[in-house]
Amino acid sequence: ARPYSFGL
């Protein structure tokens, strides 16, 4: 769960 939603 990251504050940015990228598939990284």
From Swiss-Prot:
Subcellular location: Secreted
Tissues expressing this chain: In larvae, expressed in the CNS and midgut but not in the ring gland, thoracic perisymapthetic organs (tPSO) or abdominal perisymapthetic organs (aPSO) (at protein level). In adults, expressed in the corpora cardiaca, corpora allata, brain and the thoracic-abdominal ganglion (at protein level).
Key words, A-Z: Amidation, Neuropeptide, Secreted
TM regions (residue ranges): none
Leucine amide PTM positions: 8
GO terms for biological process, alphabetical: neuropeptide signaling pathway
GO cellular component: extracellular region
Function, as annotated: May act as a neurotransmitter or neuromodulator.
Family membership: Belongs to the allatostatin family.
Name this polypeptide is given: Allatostatin-A1
Organism (species): Delia radicum
Lineage: Eukaryota, Metazoa, Ecdysozoa, Arthropoda, Hexapoda
